[in-house]
Amino acid sequence: MKLIIFTGLTLLLIVSLIDVEAQNEGACLPRGSVCTTNHAGCCSKLTCDCYRRFEKGVEKGQKCWCIPTGLKYSKKKE
């Protein structure tokens, strides 16, 4: 009887761990999402890229976005 209960509890624990792991995989940030650090959990093949914003020579903070790895944005020449 104890063996059956132990086996049932072990099986329940394994199923719960698999479910939690599957939910965590879906929690990544998609392309274009705002991230906070360079390792912020963007989905696979995406990188958190940050840049500093300036308005009239005054720094207005830093923005970070999930973009494809290797992609570089540059300022548009006017």
From Swiss-Prot:
It comes from the Eukaryota. Belongs to the neurotoxin 19 (CSTX) family. 07 (U7-Lctx) subfamily. Contains 4 disulfide bonds. It is found in: Secreted. Residues 23-26 form a propeptide. Keywords: Disulfide bond, Secreted, Signal, Toxin. This is U7-lycotoxin-Ls1h. One of its GO terms (molecular function) is toxin activity. It comes from Lycosa singoriensis (Wolf spider). The keyword Secreted applies. Residues 1-22 form the signal peptide. Expressed by the venom gland.
